[in-house]
């Protein structure tokens, strides 16, 4: 696997050892037209899920990839030789309920209160500098002057907390991050790093 490099400050070493990463790769990609997780952008060394996993591996002791039924087999094969990567899919009774389904499935690996660094495959250009900034703060999410980015976040949560939120019938990840996790915004300048691959136009602009 191609690796990316980053210098991790000494004062982050404890967080690196105690934090789990979650890569959200289970979206249906309806607007995009094909599975965003497996798309490889021109000039990038890996596909989008590979980029996300590699970045989180630099900051987390274990990375959990939340897949869907369609890409589960391919992603499992992609990370078959990665000892610190686990691929999971939605669990009953919360299948196909958006990002929170993926977060619920991922928290099954460590159900107790745990630090998680979240990154969706929608953000292939996000930098490790941005992620490192989030790691230095607890319960936070990235925001820019024009948009909030709840799937680029660092939260402390448990499977019980995710379950309780889902049982309320509220599937908005924004409410989960801000209300259940009491996440606060960390503001970054607008930049290409926050390009969200929601459609083919975004893919063209990211090239």
Specify the residue positions occupied by each region the protein language model found.
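Short, Lys/Arg-enriched N-terminal segments with co-localized hydrophobic residues
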Residues: 6-18
């Amino acid at each position: 696997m191609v690796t990316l490099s980053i210098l991790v400050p000494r004062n982050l070493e404890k967080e690196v050892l105690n934090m789990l990463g979650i890569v959200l790769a289970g979206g249906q990609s309806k607007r995009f037209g094909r599975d965003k997780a497996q798309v490889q952008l021109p000039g990038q060394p890996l596909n989008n899920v590979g980029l996300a996993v590699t970045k989180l591996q630099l900051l987390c002791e274990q990375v959990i990839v939340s897949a869907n039924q369609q890409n589960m087999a391919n992603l499992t094969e992609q990370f078959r030789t990665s000892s610190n990567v686990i691929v999971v899919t939605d669990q009953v009774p919360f299948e196909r309920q958006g990002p929170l389904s993926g977060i619920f499935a991922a928290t099954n690996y460590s159900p107790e209160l745990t630090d998680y660094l979240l990154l969706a495959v929608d953000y292939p250009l996000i930098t490790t500098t941005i992620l490192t900034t989030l790691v230095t703060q607890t319960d936070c999410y990235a925001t820019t002057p024009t948009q909030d980015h709840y799937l680029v976040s660092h939260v402390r949560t448990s499977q019980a907390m995710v379950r309780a939120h889902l049982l309320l019938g509220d599937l908005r990840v924004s409410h989960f991050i801000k209300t259940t996790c009491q996440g606060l915004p960390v503001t970054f300048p607008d930049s290409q790093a926050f390009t969200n691959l929601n459609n083919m136009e975004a893919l063209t602009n990211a090239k």
